[in-house]
């Protein structure tokens, strides 16, 4: 009796262990066709899985970014898009199938209810087919449906080139349910909404971050859920530093070499300035060729405009130097003429002194002849370029005067006073004839004639050697300080 009791206990133990052990079976033993037919019996694809609406969880797995175009304002990327929802009608836990989930092809998706989500702002999108359509559906035993697509998507980007080439772009992907409002489908992001297969690297941009957002948008026929992800790309400005900023800086600096040339090397300095200006224009046009035509000023535009101004100012400086050099040559010729007729006056005074000793003539004749002599001398000085200096030496003859009626001491004093006041009387004579008398008095009050205000071409060149580099240095400090402070990303 005791032996039978022990056998009964052993039997119950092994039977309980067998019942509690998990089923071990092969997936090949599952008849998926029969299972699908069973699940889809009396299944209506137009009815919601649940009357109170469906919560759809979405996530994106970015495989790579193909490229970004500022001209068209969009970017392309390859992404695996997943959407997950609960459909109790597809639960097969009660069927004692030897699997917790089954993977089905894209054809199965057409036979069940789907949330009909779409990328609402896409310019173009397509499902990869390599070689077959990259779509699958995973069905769990509790009725959880996981649908996945491998897509190539092109969506718009917000392009603002005011900070170019230190700018950043924002590109968005906006997801909505095309057919169902919030009473039927509610979109929500997964706990880990965005994942990257690998680091995104582009020739011109770096992906510096992304962010997700959830919104509700009101349409005339209801309120729709909207899930949005924004990718932020920062431009790599190293290319523009080496292809735009450094060459233009060297072009501006090379235009200053003309300051060290001789003043008479006009053709060489003009060639240098014009060549620098053309090179700068060509560099600027090469950069603009790959950018959209915008009406606002970009960061690079400010640099190029000031570079053109610096080179143009070198040409203006050259024009000023050439004009000053011409005036200097005219003054040199005029000084030679002036020295010649001053010698003539000295000779005339000596002859008058000798004539005084001999007597006769009178002061009146000398005073009457002084003004015509001065007029001839002034005409000769102003017409120096035409060879009037040579003619003057023969045209001007000392006045033939006789001062016998005046004593030698009075005569000498009178002649000295008359000839020392030549410049003042000539100025007074011209002042009566001119129409700008008031302006002349104002200028003489500010710039006294006894001070040397002459500026030479050499002085202008020497001043330019200092002022142009100093101005360009100040511009660089202000330019880089302002735009580096405006940058919204680390260097």
Curated annotation (Swiss-Prot):
Membrane topology: Multi-pass membrane protein
Alphabetical list of SUPFAM superfamilies matching this protein: Neurotransmitter-gated ion-channel transmembrane pore, Nicotinic receptor ligand binding domain-like
Record localization: Postsynaptic cell membrane; Cell membrane
GO molecular function: extracellular ligand-gated monoatomic ion channel activity; transmembrane signaling receptor activity
PROSITE patterns membership: NEUROTR_ION_CHANNEL
Disulphide bridges, residue numbers: 157-171
Keywords: Cell membrane, Disulfide bond, Glycoprotein, Ion channel, Ion transport, Ligand-gated ion channel, Membrane, Postsynaptic cell membrane, Receptor, Signal, Synapse, Transmembrane, Transmembrane helix, Transport
Entry's Gene Ontology BP terms: chloride transmembrane transport
Family: Belongs to the ligand-gated ion channel (TC 1.A.9) family.
Protein name: Ligand-gated ion channel 50
Species lineage: Eukaryota, Metazoa, Ecdysozoa, Nematoda, Chromadorea
């Amino acid at each position: 009796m005791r032996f039978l009791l022990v056998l009964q206990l052993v039997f119950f133990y092994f039977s309980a262990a067998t019942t509690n052990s998990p089923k071990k079976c092969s997936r090949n033993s599952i008849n998926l066709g029969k299972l699908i037919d069973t699940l889809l019996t009396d299944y209506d694809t137009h009815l919601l899985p649940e009357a109170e609406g469906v919560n759809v969880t979405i996530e994106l797995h970015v495989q790579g970014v193909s490229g970004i175009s500022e001209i068209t304002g969009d970017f392309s990327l390859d992404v695996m898009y997943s959407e997950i929802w609960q459909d109790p009608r597809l639960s097969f836990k009660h069927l004692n199938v030897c699997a917790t989930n089954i993977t089905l092809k894209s054809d199965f998706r057409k036979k069940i209810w789907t949330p009909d989500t779409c990328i609402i702002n896409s310019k173009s999108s397509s499902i990869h087919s390599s070689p077959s359509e990259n779509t699958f559906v995973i069905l769990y035993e509790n009725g959880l449906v996981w649908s996945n697509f491998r897509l190539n998507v092109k969506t718009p980007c917000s392009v603002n080139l005011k900070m170019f080439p230190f700018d950043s772009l924002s590109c968005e992907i906006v997801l909505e349910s095309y057919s169902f409002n919030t009473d039927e489908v509610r979109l929500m992001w997964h706990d880990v909404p965005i994942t990257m297969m690998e680091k995104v690297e582009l020739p011109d941009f770096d992906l510096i971050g992304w962010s997700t957002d959830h919104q509700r948008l009101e349409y005339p026929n209801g309120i729709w859920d909207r899930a949005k992800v924004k990718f932020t790309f920062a431009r790599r400005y190293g290319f523009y530093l080496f292809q735009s900023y450094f060459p233009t800086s060297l072009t501006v600096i090379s235009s200053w070499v003309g300051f060290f040339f001789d003043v008479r090397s006009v053709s060489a300095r003009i060639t240098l300035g014009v060549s620098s200006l053309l090179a700068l224009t060509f560099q600027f046009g090469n950069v603009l060729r790959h950018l959209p035509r915008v009406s606002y000023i970009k960061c690079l535009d400010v640099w190029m405009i000031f570079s053109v101004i610096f080179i143009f100012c070198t040409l203006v400086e050259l024009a000023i130097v050439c004009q000053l050099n011409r005036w200097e040559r005219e003054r040199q010729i005029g000084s030679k003429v002036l020295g010649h007729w001053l010698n003539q006056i000295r000779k005339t005074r000596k002859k008058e002194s000798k004539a005084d000793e001999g007597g006769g003539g009178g002061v009146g004749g000398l005073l009457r002849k002084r003004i015509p002599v001065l007029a001839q001398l002034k005409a000769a000085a102003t017409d120096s370029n035409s060879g009037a200096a040579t003619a003057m030496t023969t045209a001007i003859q000392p006045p033939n005067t006789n001062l016998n009626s005046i004593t030698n001491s009075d005569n000498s004093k009178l002649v000295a006073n008359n000839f020392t006041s030549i410049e003042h009387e000539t100025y007074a004579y011209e002042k009566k004839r001119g129409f700008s008398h008031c302006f002349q008095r104002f200028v003489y009050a500010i710039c006294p004639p006894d001070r040397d205000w002459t500026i030479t071409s050499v002085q202008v060149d020497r001043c330019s050697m200092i002022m142009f580099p100093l101005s360009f240095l100040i511009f660089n400090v202000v330019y880089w300080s302002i735009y580096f402070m405006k940058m919204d990303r680390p260097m």
